[in-house]
């Protein structure tokens, strides 16, 4: 990526003439390029070599004419927006994708059938026309609803644009100029100061106390020092490179631009995130599988009966009408709306629990998740450095790191602690922002870096106001922290009259501080710093460092009054005061502590077999300590390094398979082949990836997906966006998350709490179970809707159930009950189950079809036919008379058709009886659907065990009954929908069948519970 001539642009488009294969190969190559580690060598160059490579004078910068040439060659310093999907295409996908397509085909077939009838008959029935119109309306309404739900999604590049700084200070022709950041070119000499955003990737040429916040890029929460020194082979870790769009927190720096726009590290991440192919959600794959089943059944039945009707001597036009009728009757019209509404309801329920779902289908994906790759900072941890331990009086004391200060407290009476607290408060530039007196100390905003803020809050909590302490000890002189000295020093007036007038306080890297000390304070008394005390210090330092904590050393010195009288001029440039032979006081160590709820949440993920992997940009020791703290590495599980240390043998002699846990450094990951990565993911149950780059996060996600896992990724930085986009479900943080990560994600945790993910998994699993129940309920009524049509063709009887009445069931009485199943409570502890295997555990499987169609559906059809035959018999047509009567029955010109008793019936009278039969068949289906709804509440438990607590479902039972009664008895329905009033006794014909369905299924589930894995479970447990 270092660019003398500057043409290694990462554009992801290819020219058309190369043909599609070339384009695909190029795209794959581009993607592979982007996934590679950042390949920079500019950090290794000396300033002379840098001058030769970019032609930049390190005092005068580029000439304006040269800058214009480079701008013309490389283009503006801006990120290229990715090709976006137009809104109309998104809308069309909702209208014509998946399930909608099936309904459209149904609608077209209806219009076709109506067309054939209109061409061949004088007065065609309008049923097929109505059906076609209703089907089209259903698709359009649900399509608009889904589009509206998802319209708020995926604006990735817009937020990347927000990251681009507006202005930049460059030096051209020896003059400082403030120009638009888009005009910055490679080779420009740029100046940045605290508060600025870095305008491009810079090679630092000079710096004064410069620190940058790389957290959005690398995930490191601490500000990083920037200086001209080459400190690391890895360009992401070296001190002399500052990255585009990170923030300069303090100090100033001057540097040469080495990359602009898409060629910057951030540009590569942006291109990578926006050009990733996103896979389909598990639920959309399930729905497609379901459509294949339904379509298969419909076409098989349709074609079979088409051939049969031709054999039975029907005209081919009639046979085509039958074919279309059967195919359409198989389409569950209400199901599309049911699924959409169920997912929306769950999304709303999750929003109340702080999970905001951007993409409806992601609701279920989270339930199928088998691996969670979680970022550390801010997700598993509180994202605030906190003092965790102190070492003074030769003893380690534990501080309280809990969010609500409910943890341990230590002995604060020691004089050494008072001295330590005084240094931590005075040798500290952090201050609380104004007007926060009523805010709890831990929640207050602080101006200053993370470590100093932690010390400030700790001292404020333990010792009262730090401001008062600073007022009493006025600061006279200060040497700020720098990377060469590795300490910070300040001199204060001492208000305590028993001590000398001036107090020197110092903090910094523990080993550097100890080197400057000759005495140590123990229990308030100074004593010589002997080897024994040095060993004690070393042990404490190693122990705290091993906990992944950032350790600082503290010392002080009372400047003698005879040499440093009041008014003495302290010179911090030519130091005129002692900085050796000081008195060592103690250590304080800080960590970004785990969130309180995370340990429990990780445990909850573990019990159903969800693997939790930590992926972080932080140091391996810190990462491992937090992983142990939150249970990602569980107690007693060792890494290869732990085993080697325990057995006292070299690491390479340990068999990696013996270690259940594993900490992989980004540097090692870079050199692993995909096979080696697969091996790690397969054979270690507890994994931590530390010091990872954005590209590596993506490679880890792809590795998990190769194992067949459904992967959820949590993250908050820009660096997480490619992984969030690639994952089956990306989960971003709502509070700390960058805009970019929120746009790339499918779900946002509004409270940034990992524990909310567990709630999401639970809801996702529940919706999958409940969708199964809803589909089982909806499909069952398909059989009593299709069989009347089949008998109409085969047995030549008057039509028992009309098209309009079928619509009244699918889009009327069945809708509310089907949706009410989305509110059903979980049957058992769904968080104890293993994650769903997408290959074997389908939303709709053969067993569900067998129960819905073959068993319950057949009983329902029998109930309908029983009522149909009862009504016709009461009107004089016994079953034996009905066979073969259809042609005469439907003939308008036959007005003297005799029944079983010799009575003659006109066409009008016959049709009134037929439509009354349609209405009663419809009412019977409603009554048997009562039982079906109740048995669909549970797949394994008894109804008595499950209870009838679902209020929406009880409402659904009353609603469908009331609707059926309304359609039957409302005046005018005979004209509008051809539905006629029923005698009260006819409602009761279906009751025995309803009871039979209930008892049959209770018995089936009883056997299922008594004989787990038995024949009944294998054949009927859906």
UniProtKB/Swiss-Prot annotation:
Give the signal sequence positions.
none
User: What is the catalytic activity of this protein?
Assistant: K(+)(out) + Na(+)(in) + ATP + H2O = K(+)(in) + Na(+)(out) + ADP + phosphate + H(+)
Q: Which UniProt keywords apply?
A: ATP-binding, Cell membrane, Ion transport, Magnesium, Membrane, Metal-binding, Nucleotide-binding, Phosphoprotein, Potassium, Potassium transport, Sodium, Sodium transport, Sodium/potassium transport, Translocase, Transmembrane, Transmembrane helix, Transport
- The EC number(s) given in the record are 7.2.2.13
Do you know which PROSITE patterns this protein is assigned to?
ATPASE_E1_E2
Q: State the active site.
A: 375
Q: Where is the composition biased (Basic and acidic residues)?
A: 1-10
Q: Membrane-spanning residues where?
A: 87-107, 131-151, 288-307, 320-337, 772-791, 802-822, 843-865, 918-937, 951-969, 985-1005
**Places the protein is found:** Cell membrane, Sarcolemma
Q: What is its main location?
A: membrane
Which Gene3D superfamilies does the annotation name? Calcium-transporting ATPase, cytoplasmic domain N, Calcium-transporting ATPase, cytoplasmic transduction domain A, Calcium-transporting ATPase, transmembrane domain, HAD superfamily/HAD-like
CDD domains in the record, alphabetically? Answer: P-type_ATPase_Na-K_like
Q: Which residues lie on this side of the membrane: Extracellular?
A: 108-130, 308-319, 792-801, 866-917, 970-984
Query: Pro-sequence positions in this chain?
Result: 1-5
Q: Which SMART domains match?
A: Cation_ATPase_N
CC per GO annotation? membrane; plasma membrane; sarcolemma
Q: How does it assemble?
A: The sodium/potassium-transporting ATPase is composed of a catalytic alpha subunit, an auxiliary non-catalytic beta subunit and an additional regulatory subunit.
Name under which the protein is recorded: Sodium/potassium-transporting ATPase subunit alpha-1
Q: Which organism is it from?
A: Anguilla anguilla
């Amino acid at each position: 990526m270092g660019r003398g001539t500057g043409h290694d642009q990462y554009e992801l488009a290819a020219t058309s003439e190369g043909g599609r294969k070339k384009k695909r190969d190029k795209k794959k190559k581009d993607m592979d390029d982007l996934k590679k580690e950042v390949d920079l060598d500019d950090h290794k160059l000396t300033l002379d070599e840098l001058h030769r490579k970019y032609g930049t004078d390190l005092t005068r910068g580029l000439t304006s004419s040269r800058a214009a040439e480079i701008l013309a060659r490389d283009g503006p310093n801006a990120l290229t927006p990715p090709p976006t999907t137009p809104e109309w295409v998104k809308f069309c996908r909702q209208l014509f994708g998946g399930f909608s397509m099936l309904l459209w085909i149904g609608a077209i077939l209806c219009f076709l059938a109506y067309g054939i009838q209109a061409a061949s008959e004088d007065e065609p029935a309008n049923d097929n026309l109505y059906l076609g119109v209703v089907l089209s309306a259903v698709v359009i309404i649900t399509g608009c609803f889904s589009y509206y739900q998802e319209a708020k999604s995926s604006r990735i590049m817009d937020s990347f644009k927000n990251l681009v700084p507006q202005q930049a200070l460059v030096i051209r022709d020896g003059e400082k100029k403030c120009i638009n950041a888009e005009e910055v070119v490679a080779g420009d000499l740029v100046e940045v100061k605290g508060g600025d955003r870095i305008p491009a990737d810079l090679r630092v040429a000079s710096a004064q106390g410069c620190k940058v916040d790389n957290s959005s890029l690398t995930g490191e929460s601490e500000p990083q020092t920037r200086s001209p020194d080459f400190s690391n082979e890895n360009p992401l870790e070296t001190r002399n490179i500052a990255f585009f769009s990170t923030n300069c927190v303090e100090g100033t720096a001057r540097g040469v631009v080495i990359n602009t726009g898409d060629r910057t590290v951030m540009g590569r991440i942006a291109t990578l995130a926006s050009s990733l192919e996103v896979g389909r959600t598990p639920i959309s794959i399930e729905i497609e599988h379901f459509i294949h089943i339904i379509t298969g059944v419909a076409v098989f039945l349709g074609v079979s009966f088409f051939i049969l009707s031709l054999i039975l001597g029907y005209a081919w036009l009639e046979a085509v009408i039958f074919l279309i009728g059967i195919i359409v009757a198989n389409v569950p019209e209400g199901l599309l709306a049911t699924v959409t509404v169920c997912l929306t309801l769950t999304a709303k329920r999750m929003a109340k629990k702080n999970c905001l779902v951007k993409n409806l289908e992601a609701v279920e994906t989270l339930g199928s998740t088998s691996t969670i790759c979680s970022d550390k900072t801010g997700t598993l941890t509180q994202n605030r450095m906190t003092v965790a331990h102190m070492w003074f009086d030769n003893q380690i004391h534990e501080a309280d790191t809990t969010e609500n200060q409910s943890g341990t407290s230590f002995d604060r009476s020691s004089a050494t602690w008072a001295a330590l607290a005084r240094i931590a408060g005075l040798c500290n530039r952090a201050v609380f922002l104004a007007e926060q007196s009523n805010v709890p100390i831990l929640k207050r905003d602080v101006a200053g870096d993370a470590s100093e803020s932690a010390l400030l809050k700790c001292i404020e909590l333990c010792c009262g106001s730090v401001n008062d302490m600073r007022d009493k000890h006025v600061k006279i002189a200060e040497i700020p922290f720098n990377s060469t000295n590795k300490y910070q020093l300040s001199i204060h007036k001492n208000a305590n009259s028993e001590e000398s007038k001036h107090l020197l306080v110092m903090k910094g890297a523990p080993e550097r501080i100890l080197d400057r000390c000759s005495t140590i304070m123990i229990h308030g008394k100074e004593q010589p710093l002997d080897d024994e005390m040095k060993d004690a210090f070393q042990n404490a330092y190693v122990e705290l460092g091993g906990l992944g904590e950032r350790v600082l050393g503290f010392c002080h010195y009372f400047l003698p009054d005879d040499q440093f009288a009041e008014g003495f001029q302290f010179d911090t440039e030519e130091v005129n005061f002692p900085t050796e032979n000081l008195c060592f006081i103690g250590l304080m160590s800080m960590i970004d502590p785990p969130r309180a709820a995370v340990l429990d949440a990780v445990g909850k993920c573990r019990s159903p077999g969800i693997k939790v992997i930590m992926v972080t940009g932080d140091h391996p020791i810190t990462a491992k300590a937090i992983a142990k703290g939150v249970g990602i590495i569980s107690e007693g599980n060792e890494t290869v390094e732990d085993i080697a240390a325990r057995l006292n043998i070299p690491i390479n002699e340990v068999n990696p398979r013996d270690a259940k846990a594993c900490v992989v450094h980004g540097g090692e990951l870079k050199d692993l082949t995909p096979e080696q990565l697969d091996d790690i993911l397969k054979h270690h149950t507890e994994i931590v990836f530390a010091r990872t780059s954005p590209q590596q996060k993506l490679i880890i996600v792809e590795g998990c997906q190769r194992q067949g896992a459904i992967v959820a990724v949590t993250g908050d930085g820009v660096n997480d966006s490619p992984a969030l986009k690639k994952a089956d479900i990306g989960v971003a943080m709502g509070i700390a998350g960058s805009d970019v990560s929120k746009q790339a994600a499918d779900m946002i945790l509004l409270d940034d709490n990992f524990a909310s993910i567990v709630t999401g998994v639970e809801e996702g699993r529940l919706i999958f179970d409940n969708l199964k129940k809803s589909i089982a309920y909806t499909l069952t009524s398909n059989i009593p809707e299709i069989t009347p049509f089949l008998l109409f063709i085969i047995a030549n009887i008057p039509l028992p159930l009309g098209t309009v009445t079928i619509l009244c069931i699918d889009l009327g009485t069945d809708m509310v009950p089907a949706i009410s199943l989305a509110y059903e409570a979980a049957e058992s502890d769904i968080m104890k189950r293993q994650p769903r295997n997408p290959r074997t555990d389908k939303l709709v499987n053969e067993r569900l079809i067998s129960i819905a169609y073959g068993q319950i559906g057949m009983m329902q059809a029998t109930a309908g036919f029983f009522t149909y035959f009862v009504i016709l018999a009461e009107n004089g047509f016994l079953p034996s008379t009905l066979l073969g009567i259809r042609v005469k029955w439907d003939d308008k010109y036959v007005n003297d058709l005799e029944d079983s008793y010799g009575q003659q019936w006109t066409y009008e009278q016959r049709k009134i009886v037929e439509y009354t039969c349609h209405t009663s068949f419809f009412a019977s289906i409603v009554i048997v659907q009562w039982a079906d709804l109740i048995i669909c509440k549970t797949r394994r438990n008894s109804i008595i065990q499950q209870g009838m607590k679902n209020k929406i479902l009880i409402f659904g039972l009353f609603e469908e009954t009331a609707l059926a009664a309304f359609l039957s008895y409302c005046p005018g329905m005979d004209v509008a929908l051809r539905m006629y009033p029923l005698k009260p006794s006819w409602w009761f014909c279906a009751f025995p069948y309803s009871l039979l369905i209930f008892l049959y299924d209770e018995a089936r589930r009883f056997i299922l519970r008594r004989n787990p894995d038995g024949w009944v479970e294998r054949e009927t447990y859906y």
